[in-house]
Amino acid sequence: MDKLVVNGAKELSGSVEISGAKNAVLPLMAATLLTEGEHTINRVPDLKDTRTFLNLLEMLGAKSTYNNGDLLVDSSTINSVEAPYDLVKTMRASFYVMGPLLGRFGEARVSLPGGCAWGPRPVDYHLKGFEKLGAEIILEKGYIIARAKKLKGAQIHFDIPSVGATANILMASVLAEGKTQITNAAIEPHIVQLCKVLNEMGAHIEGVGSNILFVNGVEKLSPMKVETIPDMIEAGTFLIAGATLGNITLKKVDPTHLNIVIRKLEQAGCELVVNDNSITVNKCDKLQPVDMTTDVHPGFPTDLQAQWVALMSVANGSSHITDTIYHDRFAHVPELIRLGADISLNKNMALIRGPKKLKGAQVMSTDIRAS
């Protein structure tokens, strides 16, 4: 069994360069399927998910080289439109290939996705969007098959902003005939980057950065050359860690992606120095409790909820943490209690009573954020 041994009560100091964002690079990798040619993506993090997605692109026929964060993908040799179960089951983001395959080839065959176990993350928004664009959707032997002679622009509305569906519908609609309007679209930084990159490739997307996107379909795109934006979740994790015991500087970061996290840390009594592409956080001598509710961007990210719960367990007072995105995402709470935290759960809300002196113990990791 894999394990990490942590010797605690050590002050953190120094600087760290933030990696490229996994959540940004995966849809960019999918977008290489939209057109033939050699695509260049820099600052690609070397992670299991990026390696898995690269394997998927190669199974579809793409050729690639990956070296020290630089990825080259030649999508001129795509010879399959099927994303097999063995790969898709390990990573929900594999579903991103459906939009570009459908847009470029008029057909996609993708296994129902797998991924993290907590909370429902249906692909209904994706499929309903494809249908509005004119695709026929069939479920057959665990595979979703989408076909269309030519996608046509449509008005598409999401009841709840969906990052995955927004990205998928964008990639399908840039090659559709006519105009597509997407309302209540996700506005996360990686969606903004995807829009900008698609426009640089020759797409016509208006309203970038807002929750209403207008896409005028084009006949052909050019290959991309892009550097992935910094990972706001990695950066936020280091900021929260630095607030406990330390003085650390984050480099190659975009502070505008972390406005809500910076504000919450300042409310907790932390001193931060924010520059154009760096953030320094000093430990909080008297950490104050701060309530937090997760929300879609620009709200507090659900991917930083577990880290904030851990921080608040040593704050001087009680705080309430509510997760409105994934109501069951509290597997870390029983493990923090094993360390000495005083936390009680009520549905999707955690009541944390601090301060508690946490002590080392054996704990179990159930998912990446709980770790």
Q: Predicted segment positions?
A:
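Short, structured segments at the rim of ligand-binding sites
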Residues: 1-371
